[in-house]
Amino acid sequence: MSSEFLSELHWEDGFAIPVANQENKILEDQLAKLHKEKSNLQDQLRDYEDRINSMSSHLKNVNQEFLFTQSLYKARECEIESEEHFKAIAERELGRVKDEIQQLEKEMAIILERKNDKENAIFKATQKLDGLKCQMNWDQQALEAWLEESAHKDSDSLTLQKYSQQDNNKIRALTLKLEKLTMECNEKRKLLDNELTETLSAQLELDKAAQDFRKIHVERQELIQQWENTIEQMQRRDQEIDNCALALARIKQEAREKEGVVREKIKFLENEVGNNVEYERRISIAERKVSKCRMEYQRQEANRNQLKDELDTLKTTLNRTSSDLEALRKNISKVKKDILDETGRLQKLKHHNEIVKHKLKMITEKTISIEEKATNMEDMLKEEEKNLKEVEVQLNIVKGVLFKKVQELQSAITKEKALGSEIEGTRSSLKHLNQRLHKLDFETLKQQEIMYSQDFYIQQVERRMSRLKGEINSEEKQALEVKIVELRKTMEERKSTLSLLEEQIKKLHNDLYFIKKSNGKNKDEKESLMNKIGELHLFVDRSEKELNKAKAVKEDLMIEDNLLKLQVKRARELLYSKAEEVLSLEKRKQQLCTAMEERVEEIKVHKAMLTSQIRYVDQQRQTVSSEFHERLSKIDKLKNRYEILTVVMLPPEGEEEKTQSYYVIKAAQEKEELQREGDSLDAKISKAEKEIYALQNTLQVLSSCNNNYKQSFKKVTPSSDEYGIKIQLEEQKRSADEKYRCKQRQIRELQEDIQSMENTFEVIEHLANNAREKLSEKQTLSFQLRKETEEQKPKIQRVTKQCGRLRREIRILRQTNDETLEEQDIQLREIIQFHKDIDQMLVNAMENAEIHVIFQTYFQQNGLELPTAKGPSSRSSSQSSLSSIRSLEDSIPISPPTAKVIELRFPGPPARSDSSRSSSGSNSNIPKGKKLNK
C-alpha cells in the first residue's frame, strides 16, 4: 500500500519515507478501534440475522406441525364419528333382532295354541264318535221306536232325501273350500320361501357391506398410524434441523471470530511488510543481500536444471509418442492417398491422355488424313466396347481394395485415438511441469530484478556524485564515435543494395522466360482440376440420387411397418376377444357345473320328498282299503246281526210286527251313510291318484331334463354337428396362431432390414459428407487456382507483348521476315519439354502395377520401349544434342515428323443409370480409348 501511494506521489527512492507524528498515531489507533467495533457490531448483526432466520424457519416448521396435528385431530374426530355410527348401527341391528325374536316367540305361542286347539277338537271329535258308537250300540230300542214312528209317515223319506242333498252340497262346498285353502297355503309357502331367500341375500349383502366397512376402517386406522409415524419423523427431522441450525450459527460465529483474527493478522502482516520495506531501504550493507540473492539464484538454477532434465525426458517421451503418432498418421494418409489414387488415378489418366491427344492432334493434323481418322475412330469404338468389361473387372478389384483400406483406416483411427489420449496425458503432465518451470523462472526473474534494481540504484548514485563533481563521461564520446561508424556502414550497405538491385533486374528478365513455361503448366493443371471438379459434381449428384432412393425405400418400409403393426394390432384384438370368449365360456361352464350340482341336490331332495309323499299316500291308501274292508266286514256283521235281531226281535205272539218299511228305511239310512263314507273315500283315493300321476309326470320331466343336462356334459362324438364346429374353431385358432407367428417373423425381418438400411444410410451419409468436404476443399483449391491464373493473365499478356516486340526487333535487326534460329530453337525446346512431360506423366501413371501391365502390352504390340524416369544427367546430354541439331538444321531441310500412334484403352467406371450416362456424355467428351503419339 505504501509503495503504491508513494508511486502516485512520484516519491524518489533516495529520500526517506515520512512517518506520522504522535497525534496522527493516536488518531490511527482510534480509527483502528472504531474499525474493530464496527466489525464486532457487524458480526453481532449477522448473528442476530442468522438467529432471526433460524427462528422464522422454526416458526414455519411449528406452523406446519400445527397443521399436521389439526389434520390428525380431524381424522381422529372422523374416526370417532364413524365408530359411533357403527355402534348406533349395531344397536339398531340388535333391537331389530330382538324384535324378530319376540315376533317369532309370539308366532310360536300362537302356533302352539292352535295346535292345542286342534288337538282338543280332535279329542272332542273322537269322544263324539265314541259316544255315537255307544249310542248306536246301546240305543237300539230308541232307534227302533223312532223307526216305527217314522215308518208311519211318508214325508220322512222326503225330508231325508232333502237333508242328504243338503249334506252333499255342503260336502262339495267344503271340499272346494279345502282345495282353495290348500292352494293358498302353497302360494303362501312359496312367498315365504321367496321372502326367506331375499332376506338371506339381503343378510349376505349386509354382512359383506359390514366386512367392507370393517376393512375400510382398518385401512383408515393404518393410514392414520402412518400419518402419525410421518409426523413423528418430521418432528425428529425438525429437531435435527434445529440442532443443525444451532451448530451452523455456532460455526458461523467461530468463522467470524477466526476472520477477525485473520484480519488482525493481515493488518499486522501489512504493517510488518511496510516496516520491512522501510528497513530494507535503510539498510546500508547491500553486499550481504546480493550474496544471499546469488545463493538463492544458484539454488533456483539447480532446481531449474533438474526440472529441465525432467522436461527433456518428458520431451523425449513426447517426441517418441509424437513420432509414433506421425508414423500412424502417415500410414493413414498413405492409405487415404491410395484410396484416392485408386479412385482418381483413372480419371487423371483419362484427362492426361486427352490433353496429350489434343496436343498430338495439333502437331499431326497435317499428316493424318480424314480416312485414317475414320478408321482410328472405328478402332477406338471397338476397343472401347472391349475395355468396358475390363474396366468393370478392375473397378470390382478397386472396390475390394477400397473396402480393405477402409477397414485398415478404421483400425488406424482407433489406434490414433488411443495414442491421442496418451499424448493428451503426456501433454497435461508437460503443462504441469511447464507451469512449475514458469513459476521458478518467475521467481528467478524477481530475484534478478531485485539485483538489477540494487545495481541500478548504485549506478544512479555514482552518476549523481560524478555530475556533482563536474566530470565528463567517456561513454558518451564513445557512443558518438560508434554512431559515426554505423552511418558510414549504412552508406556502404546502400551502395551494395543498389548493385544488387541492378543484378536482380537482369535476373527478372531471365525469369520471364521461365514464368511463361510455368504459366503453361498452370493452365494444364487448371484444366485437370476443372475436370476433377466436374467429376466430383457428378459423384455428388449420383450420391444425392441414391440418398433420395434410400429415403423413398425407407419411407416405404416405414409404411409397410405401420401396416403390419395395424394388422398385428387387429390380430391381437381378435385374439383378446377370442380369449375373453373362451374365459366367458369357461366361467359359464363353471357356473353350469355349480348350477348342475345344486340342481342335482335339489332333485335329490325333491325326489326324497316325492318318495316320502308316495310312501305316505300308499300308507293312506292301505289304511283306506283296510278301513273299507273293515266297513264291508262290519256291513256283513250288521247284516248277520240284523238277521239275528229280526229273528230275536220277532214280536211275541199277540204283538204287532214291525212293518217292512221300517226296516227298509233303516237299511236305506245305513246305506246312505255307508255311501257317503264310500264317496268320501273314493274322492280321497282319486285325489291321491291324481297327485301321484302329477308327481310321476313331474318326475319324468325332471329325469328328462337331467338326462339332457348330462348329455350336454358328455364328450362330443365325431358324428355330431358340434364336433364339426369345434374342429372349425380349432382350425381357425391354429391359422390365426400361424398368421400371428408369420407376422411376428415378418416384423422381426423388417426391423432387421430397417436396421441394416439405417446402417447403410449412415455409411452413405458419411461418404456423402466426406465427398462434400472433398468437394469444398477442391472448390477452394480451384478458386485459388482461378485467382492465381487471373493474377498471372496480365503478366502473361505483358510477357507475350514484350516477346512479340523483341521478335520484331530481332527480325528487323537481321532484316528477315522468316523465323530465326533462336525461335526454332525455342520451339524445339518446347517440343522436347512437352515430350519429357508426357514421359513423366506415363512414368507416374505406370507406378500402378495394373496400368504398367496395360502400357507394356500396348507398347510391345507397337514395337516401342517404355519411357523411364530420367535423372539430372539427361539435361546436359539434351543441351549437347541441341548444338548438333542446330548445325544440322542448315544442311537438312525441315520435314514434318512422322508420328506413331499408340492406342491405349483404360477401364472406365461402369454406368450406374441412363441419366448418369447422358449427363456424363453431355458434360465431358473424354473418350475411353486414349491415343498416344510417340
Curated annotation (Swiss-Prot):
Keyword Oxidoreductase attached: no
Residue spans of biased composition, Low complexity class: 873-892, 912-925
Keywords: Cell projection, Cilium, Coiled coil, Cytoplasm, Cytoskeleton, Phosphoprotein
Phosphoprotein listed as a keyword: yes
GO cellular component: 9+2 motile cilium; axoneme; cilium; cytosol; extracellular region; glial cell projection
Domain of life: Eukaryota
Compartments reported by the entry: Cytoplasm, Cytoskeleton, Cilium axoneme
GO BP annotations, alphabetical order: axonemal dynein complex assembly; brain development; central nervous system myelination; cerebral cortex development; cerebrospinal fluid circulation; cilium movement; cilium-dependent cell motility; determination of digestive tract left/right asymmetry
Coiled coil region boundaries: 17-133, 164-512, 540-615, 664-826
Positions of post-translational Phosphoserine modification: 887, 895
Spans annotated as Disordered: 866-934
Function of the molecule: Required for assembly of dynein regulatory complex (DRC) and inner dynein arm (IDA) complexes, which are responsible for ciliary beat regulation, thereby playing a central role in motility in cilia and flagella. Probably acts together with CCDC40 to form a molecular ruler that determines the 96 nanometer (nm) repeat length and arrangements of components in cilia and flagella. Not required for outer dynein arm complexes assembly.
Family: Belongs to the CCDC39 family.
UniProt protein name: Coiled-coil domain-containing protein 39
Organism ancestry: Eukaryota, Metazoa, Chordata, Craniata, Vertebrata
